[in-house]
């Protein structure tokens, strides 16, 4: 917050494994910090789980596996809770969407997944290139640029591979609007003060 970052992306890994949110107390603690918006994902498989996440203070809910495997459920959530609060989480592996912690692939491309929900107002997508996540080898730039050009009304958030400020500056110059930065911060490759002055990352950091 001291560096101007107000949107924190958090993945409940325990929740993803258990198929239901497991760290709501942590969410409540984070959400209680003034000036912070929490973007929370992991284990949101039912409407009760979604309601619990919002009740615990999340500003945004990231839904991945359900959107790919039970699309009618995600459509209903977009309509009930609003596209401004619902984020489509799409993990991509070799061109196909992966679900359930990257353990399974479904017969869908990222484009098909986005197309399914556009009529319901979808406006936020976090796309993670599984092969690059946590590798610090640079993002799959071509993928993100193509998606952002194809879907100008959707904010395509870059996730995976960010290794340095040059990666972020390059993405910004190519028209990308949002990026999640995690491991590069933890390992000291990117300083929070540098993110503060960059428009692409202002307001969003991975937690």
Predicted region positions:
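Short, acidic/polar
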Residues: 1, 45-51, 106-116
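C-terminal helical cap(s) of enzyme catalytic domains, especially alpha/beta-barrels
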Residues: 72-81, 172-207
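Conserved, mostly hydrophobic/aromatic
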Residues: 8, 53, 88, 125, ...
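Conserved anion-binding
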Residues: 58-133
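Glycine-rich, proline-tolerant flexible connector loops at the mouths of alpha/beta enzymes
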Residues: 7-26, 127-137
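Catalytic cores of alpha/beta
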Residues: 26, 33-34, 38-60, 142-178
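Charged helix-capping and loop-helix junction motifs
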Residues: 21-28, 103-112, 137-146
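Catalytic domains of carbohydrate-active enzymes, especially glycoside hydrolases
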Residues: 1-11, 119-121, 125
């Amino acid at each position: 917050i001291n560096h101007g970052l107000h949107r924190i992306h958090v993945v409940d890994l325990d929740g993803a494994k258990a198929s239901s949110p497991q760290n709501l107390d942590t969410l409540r603690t984070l959400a209680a910090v003034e000036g912070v918006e929490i973007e929370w994902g992991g284990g949101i498989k039912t409407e009760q789980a979604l309601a619990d996440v919002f009740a615990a203070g999340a500003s945004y809910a990231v839904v991945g596996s359900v959107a790919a495997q039970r699309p009618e459920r995600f459509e209903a959530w977009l309509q009930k809770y609003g596209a401004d609060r619902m984020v489509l989480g799409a993990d991509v592996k070799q061109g196909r969407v992966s679900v359930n912690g990257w353990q399974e692939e479904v017969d869908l491309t990222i484009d098909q997944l986005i197309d399914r929900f556009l009529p319901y107002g979808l406006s936020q997508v976090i796309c993670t290139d599984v092969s690059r996540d946590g590798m610090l080898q640079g993002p799959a730039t071509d993928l993100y640029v193509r998606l952002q050009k194809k879907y100008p009304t959707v904010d395509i958030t870059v996730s995976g591979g960010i290794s340095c400020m040059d990666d972020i500056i390059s993405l910004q110059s190519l028209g990308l609007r949002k990026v999640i930065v995690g491991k590069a911060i933890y390992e000291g490759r990117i300083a929070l003060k540098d993110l503060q002055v960059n428009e692409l990352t202002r307001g969003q950091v991975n937690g």
